[in-house]
Amino acid sequence: MKNYSAGYIREQSLTMNNYVTEAINLKSYNLNDADKIILMYSKENGLIKGVAKGIKKPKSKLGARMDLLVANTLQLLKGRSMDTILQAQTVNNFRKTKEDIDKIMLSSYVSELVVNLGEGSEAASEEIYELLYKDLNRIADSTEKKDALIAVIKFQLKLLLIMGFCVELDTCLCCRERVLDEEMFFSSQMGGIICKECNETLGVKLKMHHKIRDFLQAMLQFDFNYESDYDKKANEKVCQVCFNLLDEYIKTHTNKKQKTTKVIQELVAL
């Protein structure tokens, strides 16, 4: 089979019914005995679906390019109800992830987040695509479980920010004053932190250590690829607390329950 370059694919997209995009495979569904539907997140159009014809046949021209968690440059043919994938050139198959079950599960979690939250995100599609790509790459290249977990936590925070569900970590949601005390509380329902004084009335039960708050602020504020002192000093226990807190927040504010959450919770508890 010819190995087409991304540039070649773009040059061949000459008709109005054809288009080219870069996309990451998130889910697949059986369509019939030979074909599959691939759900992808694309740089230009957000969530898209495409039919991979003949993908189940041994000599399929698309082959492993349609595996989950693979980034491709694609040429697609627009259809009335479903587009068809004509050509694909792999940009990154995140090979190191496929060799490690923990990395597979963490990558599956972030891809499921995009599936659950990505509907209607076309205006921010390039930003979300780049964030997803960086995160999958960071998970693949991580050498310690802690580093892979930090990548997931950064993704949770930054995707929530893009989608308009940002966690409030600086000021009390009740009195709107900056929380400077070491003692504070966290409310998933309200969307962030509550100061000690206000909580005497509210009665939020979940205490948040100020170091957890500081860690989350750093993960949200710094560039994705920047390794801060917080990254270096964090341990798996800190990551476990932060992951669970953010996952509960996501479930509360989006009404979307992640199917992979339980597996990840078991993974970080090991």
Regions found by a protein language model. Give the residues of each.
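Non-catalytic alpha-helical scaffolds and adjoining flexible linkers that form interface surfaces
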Residues: 3-36, 41-270
